[in-house]
A protein has these predicted regions:
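S-adenosyl-L-methionine
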Residues: 1-27
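Conserved SAM/SAH-binding beta-strand->alpha-helix loop
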Residues: 59-61
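A short acidic, Gly/Pro-enriched loop at the edge of an enzyme's catalytic core
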Residues: 84-93
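Helix-to-beta-strand junctions that scaffold the AdoMet/dcAdoMet cofactor pocket
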Residues: 112-114
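Conserved class I S-adenosyl-L-methionine
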Residues: 30-38
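Conserved SAM-binding strand-loop segment of SAM-dependent methyltransferases
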Residues: 70-82
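Conserved beta-strand signature within the Rossmann-like core of class I S-adenosyl-L-methionine
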Residues: 116-123
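Core SAM-dependent methyltransferase catalytic element
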Residues: 163-181
Length: 181
């Protein structure tokens, strides 16, 4: 008898626990940009909380999982090859989880409204022990988010180091509020 394994392509991971812990920093019903949104684990949850979400990712197929969800606008864009499509936009919050492209850092700041919040979480050096990503280009150095976003942002929360959930990894996490000019 043959055994088959079905791969669920519609499965969406739960939202980032870091995002869940700091969502109260975002203006209620505000506009949120979810960078590298994928299938929308964070965008879906944010929309359910009443936020107006713009989800951007280069993978149009993955983003199709969100096409019929109220409160989410989809933008297919390769941010590494074709630049930043939000030069004329400002958001109440920008969420970046498990994605790193350092040339975007200044654009993230510019696209935050005054008092807007950046919630960032991605892998850092030491992740090589746990698996991918292991390429140093995709791993933050210790304190790199702090160095990249101060003084433009007031740092509200920061942590770095090993995380056990949902699976062991090495993360750097930051929440920062854009200072008024």
């Amino acid at each position: 008898m043959a055994h088959f394994t079905l791969l669920r392509t519609d499965f969406v991971e739960p939202p980032s626990t870091w995002l869940e812990a700091h969502v109260a920093c975002i203006r209620p019903q505000g506009s949120v940009l979810d960078v590298a949104a994928g299938k929308g684990r964070n965008a879906r949850w944010l929309a359910q909380q009443g936020f107006r979400v713009e989800a951007v990712d280069r993978d149009a197929e993955a983003m199709q999982a969100m096409r019929d969800i109220d409160g989410i606008t989809l933008q297919v864009a390769d941010l590494e090859q074709h630049g930043w499509p939000y030069a004329d936009h400002q958001f109440d919050a920008i969420v970046v989880c498990r994605y790193l492209h350092r040339p975007l850092f200044p654009h993230l700041i510019d696209s935050l409204a005054p008092d807007g919040v950046l919630i960032y979480e991605t892998f850092m050096q030491g992740q090589e022990v746990y698996g991918k990503p292991s390429n140093p280009d995709f791993l933050l150095k210790p304190d790199e988010l702090l160095e990249a976003f101060q003084p433009a942002l007031e740092i509200l929360a920061f942590e770095q180091g090993p995380q056990e959930s949902p699976k062991p990894c090495m993360l750097q996490r930051m929440v920062g509020r854009k200072r008024r000019s």
